[in-house]
Amino acid sequence: ECSAIATNRLGSSFDIQGGGSDLKFPHHEFSAAHAEAALGVKRMAQSYVHTGMIGLDGTKMSKSLGNLVFVHKLVEAGVDPSAIRLGVFAGHYRADRDWSDDVLRTAQERLQRWREALSHPGTVEEVKEVIQHLRLALADDLDTPRAIAVLDEWAKKAPESGEATEEASDLLRTAVNSLLGVRL
């Protein structure tokens, strides 16, 4: 049914199909075989992107165990969506990883440090260099842990720069929001 839904919505061939690593085999391979045989196309999806599984405190999250963490419930509880995003981005998208109160706390602290560092971001040229390194990390298989490390390093050095221009702050704020979806 997945190949029927995908090809109905996206056509007989499309660029990217994604899902959890647990769907790689046999699910995605069977779906592709069905669609390719039925529609006579060489490849249903040109690329497949499979994410790692996220566990909770060392246990696989599942409906049957009742241990799911819902983003909307975290937001309803007052958690900043940008902190949630940073917590998820702390691990590479293909790697299995764990969600915990510690992961969230670390992400919240990181977000606060980045926001504080915006008051003295460095020169426009320095900020442009940070953004370039951020882009390079994301261009390398969406390496969000490396992207976060780039911004952590910037935030650590920011107080030393003493430079505070609204242009530099706005430039970095816009880049981080655009590239990571994190609001500073």
Over which residues does each language-model region extend?
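Alpha-helical recognition segments enriched in aromatics with Gly/Pro capping
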Residues: E1-G122
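Feature 926 captures the class I aminoacyl-tRNA synthetase adenylation module centered on the KMSKS loop
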Residues: A38, K42, P81, G91-L184
